[in-house]
């Protein structure tokens, strides 16, 4: 049985950064019929978490205040709703919680059965918790938008991955190489060797003239760009794209949406495509299995106890994490 109260981190309004995070004791949530109550073993943060706090998606998210942030968790099922049939008490799982409700920075959380997958013993809680948003975003960008076959059977393509040392980026490099693509990647100078070690064929320091211009050292034009960085205008991408090259924007803002619309209206072959993550169980199970088979690795930037969750929040806000930031109750 779960305890009646749990430790959690909340914030009660927009803005404030780490100073607005409060450690509280709150009631353990009750699962609905299609939900699981999880005892959290590890959670991870994504940039969208602090952006929601900042108010980027107001008034849509969060749905109410106070809110417990975070969506990516691994844990053990301690209670299953009456309509749940894929899991039982004691099962180890990985889940993505709704951004509308959050809940990851706590000792317990409720997860929808249809957003939860089994975690095999070969995958640690930290490795599992790191996957949902970051690995699924990379997977969706490459398979749905770039049409890459991750078994390597498709036509060889040239891919650019920006912010390649971050959460999404480090998965995207590995998945793209499974798909037999030529990968050019950008990152900071301190991470050049790290990104090469993930399998990238060419790595650019984004602060150098070559990196800032996104020019392939071998002169290749990019069929697809998996774009997770910020502040790069369309005019920088366009001359580096192949005839029908596409930029897949993982964090589209108003300018990106205007570019997307304009390129559609003018029937341009070169396109900017905004990505909205749609988690799907088969994809979720696929990336977990890749970790199990040691074909995909989770690189952990740092681990923090829940009692020092504000340190993890500060780290994700800084924007320079290498891999994933883990919080453990």
Curated annotation (Swiss-Prot):
Cleavable signal peptide: none
Location of this chain's protein in the cell: Plastid, Chloroplast inner membrane
Post-translational modification, as annotated: The transit peptide is not cleaved.
InterPro entries in the record: ADH-like_N, Chloroplast_QOR, GroES-like_sf, NAD(P)-bd_dom_sf, PKS_ER
UniProt GO MF annotations: oxidoreductase activity
Swiss-Prot/TrEMBL keywords: Chloroplast, Membrane, NAD, Oxidoreductase, Plastid, Plastid inner membrane
GO terms under cellular component: chloroplast inner membrane
Free-text comment on this protein's domains from its UniProt entry: Neither the N-terminal nor the C-terminal are essential for chloroplastic localization of the protein. An internal region (59-Pro-Ala-100) is essential but not sufficient for plastid localization.
Family designation: Belongs to the zinc-containing alcohol dehydrogenase family. Quinone oxidoreductase subfamily.
Annotated protein name in UniProt: Quinone-oxidoreductase homolog, chloroplastic
Organism: Spinacia oleracea (Spinach)
